[in-house]
């Protein structure tokens, strides 16, 4: 149920990128650096 905490949006852990709750859903984070200074 808590896919947001473990998988984020496309299956990557939040810890790996820092935060996929925002840019993770919109674009591949593996190609984009973490632009979010938090997680919102």
Swiss-Prot record:
Disulfide bonds join 9-25. One of its GO terms (molecular function) is toxin activity. InterPro entries: Natr_peptide (IPR000663), Natr_peptide_CS (IPR030480). It holds the Pfam family ANP. Its main location: secreted. It is found in: Secreted. Residues 36-40 form a propeptide. One of its GO terms (biological process) is regulation of blood pressure. Keywords: Disulfide bond, Hypotensive agent, Secreted, Toxin, Vasoactive, Vasodilator. One of its GO terms (cellular component) is extracellular region. Expressed by the venom gland. The keyword Disulfide bond applies. Snake venom natriuretic peptide that targets both NPR1 and NPR2. Exhibits hypotensive and vasodepressor activities. Belongs to the natriuretic peptide family. This is Natriuretic peptide PaNP-b.
């Amino acid at each position: 149920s808590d896919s947001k905490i473990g998988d984020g949006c496309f299956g990557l852990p939040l810890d790996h990128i820092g935060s996929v709750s925002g840019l993770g859903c919109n674009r591949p984070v593996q190609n984009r650096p973490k632009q979010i200074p938090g997680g919102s």
